[in-house]
Amino acid sequence: MARISFSYLCPASWYFTVPTVSPFLRQRVAFLGLFFISCLLLLMLIIDFRHWSASLPRDRQYERYLARVGELEATDTEDPNLNYGLVVDCGSSGSRIFVYFWPRHNGNPHDLLDIKQMRDRNSQPVVKKIKPGISAMADTPEHASDYLRPLLSFAAAHVPVKKHKETPLYILCTAGMRLLPERKQLAILADLVKDLPLEFDFLFSQSQAEVISGKQEGVYAWIGINFVLGRFDHEDESDAEATQELAAGRRRTVGILDMGGASLQIAYEVPTSTSVLPAKQEEAAKILLAEFNLGCDVQHTEHVYRVYVTTFLGFGGNFARQRYEDLVLNETLNKNRLLGQKTGLSPDNPFLDPCLPVGLTDVVERNSQVLHVRGRGDWVSCRAMLSPLLARSNTSQASLNGIYQSPIDFNNSEFYGFSEFFYCTEDVLRIGGRYHGPTFAKAAQDYCGMAWSVLTQRFKNGLFSSHADEHRLKYQCFKSAWMYQVLHEGFHFPYDYPNLRTAQLVYGREVQWTLGAILYKTRFLPLRDLRQEGVRQAHGSWFRLSFVYNHYLFFACILVVLLAIVLYLLRLRRIHHRQTRASAPLDLLWLEEVVPMMGVQVGP
């Protein structure tokens, strides 16, 4: 096949080539492109941080620290966003009024109101107590409102006047009123409901004055403790005090043990699903279990709790000592009568009490009967003598006095012990805080074995807590044995149970059951703030949505620009390489064809 070709030689001035791209130019273009992209990325990060920093999770432990510090400061009564609430605790020996406050709800339906106790200008808690108890008005119920007037006047002076009409008042009566006949209870409450609104502008209705049961009081105490400890917070946080969480992000709540002078109380959360029980135990469980929702929306179950609560009258430290002395007196006198002995009838032949320090002498009197006792400090024998007072049954699911007890998962639980649980471990033994059974038993046994003269000398030398007195020294041996038996034999706590903490204060303050009461009573108040927040969010939702979309669009544009710069640099590189490969043959062809025409000899 023949090949036809055409050739046309142009003047040298007509020839041109693509200019070579220097490395310096490429570096300059790349530097400018990267600088431009870096500026855009930095601008995007600044905008992103300023827009979303408010919603980023903060250090919850640091926030809680700030909240605790803030609770010790005087309440700013000039703040119009603060709300107030009053709770009157009408007890058996007196009545106290507590003033609480809280800011506007944060708009998160998962959070409760942030209720705190009000503090005056001197940063002291706003609380006032009067005596006697309101039950003293049983025969003159028409004076019940006069009885409470000093408390309400005190509260009215601390709550801003413009807030009175929206400040709820709750009058909750406990042990003293429970002992009165229902007719007298209703007469006292009726006088309060009728007369108090005539003098005070607080938000108060008939349902806000009531006599609460021991079960309700226990539930309120459980709510208050767990609220202060932050156990109702459902965020995922690294708090060393409570890192274990339950299903659906719920944190593990703590149980409470509270031993007073006359009664003993236990309260703890139980699973919603329990094993099938016999009919008799099932009925007992229903009486002792309380299920409630602390959330503001009944449709949401994240704040639904099921709590076992029981109060044991006569199982407090002082009352248990009286029961023990009655037991010793009766058994000793009966034994003397049967065996013809005279133990305890004179100081020379006393009854040797294992629950008193060595050498301590005392006299037990009941009516006309007298028993002389002297301590022998045998803690193990003391525990054995106290076992019958627990009145346990043979069933494994029964605790003190044969009362049904819901199972406790001791491998996944935590308890706080208050009142006598703290006094027994701290006032004399100085081991309050984290409880360890064997350590406590050793310290209690050593104390009981000491001579009374040695103990009194140590007390004079200030070796015990400042709260300790002669009464504590005298009955510490007995109360430590009683506490130990109640905890391990009565409630079946393992002897090496590691998650019990004895305490008097929580974060430096005493937590009253009234805090739990107002938390429960005001649980629906956040609905108002939530509705207002919903309206505000509806107006701003379009802007937030458009901002998010523009945010991602801006980021995509940066990527496109970056890709274009890279492709442009690659294109320049290919052009340069192609130009370099073609330059040598082109120059040679030009020399071979053009130079001979000029009469120049090329080659040898």
Curated annotation (Swiss-Prot):
<feature type="glycosylation site" description="N-linked (GlcNAc...) asparagine">
    <location>
        <position position="330"/>
    </location>
</feature>
<dbReference type="GO" id="GO:0030659">
    <property type="term" value="C:cytoplasmic vesicle membrane"/>
</dbReference>
<dbReference type="GO" id="GO:0003924">
    <property type="term" value="F:GTPase activity"/>
</dbReference>
<dbReference type="GO" id="GO:0043273">
    <property type="term" value="F:CTPase activity"/>
</dbReference>
<keyword id="KW-1133">Transmembrane helix</keyword>
<keyword id="KW-0460">Magnesium</keyword>
<dbReference type="GO" id="GO:0006256">
    <property type="term" value="P:UDP catabolic process"/>
</dbReference>
<dbReference type="GO" id="GO:0017111">
    <property type="term" value="F:ribonucleoside triphosphate phosphatase activity"/>
</dbReference>
<feature type="topological domain" description="Cytoplasmic">
    <location>
        <begin position="1"/>
        <end position="28"/>
    </location>
</feature>
<feature type="disulfide bond">
    <location>
        <begin position="448"/>
        <end position="477"/>
    </location>
</feature>
<keyword id="KW-0378">Hydrolase</keyword>
<keyword id="KW-0472">Membrane</keyword>
<feature type="transmembrane region" description="Helical">
    <location>
        <begin position="547"/>
        <end position="567"/>
    </location>
</feature>
<feature type="active site" description="Proton acceptor">
    <location>
        <position position="217"/>
    </location>
</feature>
<keyword id="KW-0106">Calcium</keyword>
<dbReference type="GO" id="GO:0004382">
    <property type="term" value="F:GDP phosphatase activity"/>
</dbReference>
<dbReference type="GO" id="GO:0046052">
    <property type="term" value="P:UTP catabolic process"/>
</dbReference>
<feature type="transmembrane region" description="Helical">
    <location>
        <begin position="29"/>
        <end position="49"/>
    </location>
</feature>
<dbReference type="GO" id="GO:0006254">
    <property type="term" value="P:CTP catabolic process"/>
</dbReference>
<keyword id="KW-1015">Disulfide bond</keyword>
<keyword id="KW-0325">Glycoprotein</keyword>
<comment type="function">
    <text>Catalyzes the hydrolysis of nucleoside triphosphates and diphosphates in a calcium- or magnesium-dependent manner. Preferentially hydrolyzes nucleoside 5'-triphosphates, with substrate preference for UTP &gt; GTP &gt; CTP. Hydrolyzes ATP and nucleoside diphosphates only to a minor extent.</text>
</comment>
<keyword id="KW-0812">Transmembrane</keyword>
<feature type="topological domain" description="Vesicular">
    <location>
        <begin position="50"/>
        <end position="546"/>
    </location>
</feature>
<dbReference type="InterPro" id="IPR000407">
    <property type="entry name" value="GDA1_CD39_NTPase"/>
</dbReference>
<dbReference type="GO" id="GO:0005794">
    <property type="term" value="C:Golgi apparatus"/>
</dbReference>
<dbReference type="GO" id="GO:0045134">
    <property type="term" value="F:UDP phosphatase activity"/>
</dbReference>
<dbReference type="Pfam" id="PF01150">
    <property type="entry name" value="GDA1_CD39"/>
</dbReference>
<comment type="similarity">
    <text>Belongs to the GDA1/CD39 NTPase family.</text>
</comment>
<protein>
    <recommendedName>
        <fullName>Ectonucleoside triphosphate diphosphohydrolase 7</fullName>
        <ecNumber>3.6.1.15</ecNumber>
    </recommendedName>
</protein>
<dbReference type="GO" id="GO:0046872">
    <property type="term" value="F:metal ion binding"/>
</dbReference>
<dbReference type="GO" id="GO:0046039">
    <property type="term" value="P:GTP metabolic process"/>
</dbReference>
<feature type="topological domain" description="Cytoplasmic">
    <location>
        <begin position="568"/>
        <end position="604"/>
    </location>
</feature>
<keyword id="KW-0479">Metal-binding</keyword>
<dbReference type="GO" id="GO:0034656">
    <property type="term" value="P:nucleobase-containing small molecule catabolic process"/>
</dbReference>
<keyword id="KW-0968">Cytoplasmic vesicle</keyword>
